[in-house]
Amino acid sequence: MKKKLLAAALALGSATVPALAQSGLQIYGSVDAGVDYISNAGGSHMTAVNTGRRSPDRFGFRGLEDLGGDLAAFFRLENGFSLDTGAQTSPTAYFNRYSLVGLQSRGLGSVSLGHMPDFMYEYMAPLSNAVPGLSASFNPGNLDNLANQFQFDNAVKVETAEFAGFQAGAMYGMGEVANHGTANDRRALGAQYNNGPLRVGAAYSLIHGRTVDVRGLFGVTSLFGQNIAPGAMFNASRYRSQGLGASYAIGRFTPHVLVTDVSIGNAVGRTSEHNLMAGVNIDPLGDHLNVIGISGGRSTFGDRTFNQVNLFASHLLSKRTQVYVGLNHQRAKGDGTTAGLFGYARSSDDSQTVFRVGFQNTF
């Protein structure tokens, strides 16, 4: 039972939902609420009730039908919303996180079609500083998509079954633009090994045609010939992200490290964000009911540098409910660069700290 509770604690902030073992319908989700103290949000400190910072508020449906032999059909529909307002996180898509259908062979693998995230989220996010932790522990701007803000539309995904802990996959999102070659298409590859104490993952994504809020995220007002007004986006004709990470459990301690790299550009030029995340997850009492996460990160975007420290502690009240506290601090370097933890309004200077107390329930 204790091992199940520990697994649940980690899964509360992870990317995946356990697969159904037999025919049936699963309704699942997560709701999270807490109080944040923000040291500087646009020039002033503030206290606010925010939701979905431990893990996104969401609910979904997952179904599996046994077709006989080794074959099964499955589907997954998942919606993201804001608990404090009830609003959808996406104004244009109801099932914005997952909307897919597919066939699977338990011995070989699966084929999925629809709307779904890439392997940067599914294989890399479990190795990030945000698991266990808060969304503010992700890299500045989430350009590497560890937080699943961007999904592939019109996608076909092929993924192997798990063989002795190893699994791999490939995705292609069709641009559906006549006579325009690769316009708006998306491609991804991923591989992971998860067996015993060792977990290793690698992922790669290439997107032709994506907008990026470089002004809102980093304060950039002009990039490669594009003047970026407040609220306007940079139009990246090529957007590449890749990551490599690992974790290893040693008794009560699980150190982890993750490196990601993102390149965005157009016909004029390219710029990159380089990210390093490292930390250790601790089961301090050996009772599998408490988790502590200590981590740090360093990110560079052009001539801007962001250094970050993250502290997190949670206690499981049951298999589905936990209470937690978290502290995130970021310091920015670079001419005129301001700090901005992921998911919060930017600071007016080079430093920002967020302290949060909250609780989460999954179903």
At which residue positions do the language-model features occur?
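Sec/Tat signal peptide C-region and signal peptidase I cleavage site
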Residues: 16-21
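Outer-membrane beta-barrel "beta-signal"
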Residues: 350-363
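Outer-membrane beta-barrel proteins
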Residues: 38-42, 84-88, 122-125, 168, ...
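Outer membrane beta-barrel
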Residues: 22-37, 47-175, 183-185, 192-202
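Residue-level detector of the transmembrane beta-barrel scaffold of outer-membrane proteins
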Residues: 26-28, 72-74, 110-112, 167-169, ...
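Detector for outer-membrane/organellar transmembrane beta-barrel domains
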Residues: 189-315, 361
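Transmembrane beta-strands of outer-membrane beta-barrel pores
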Residues: 33-39, 79-83, 117-119, 172-176, ...
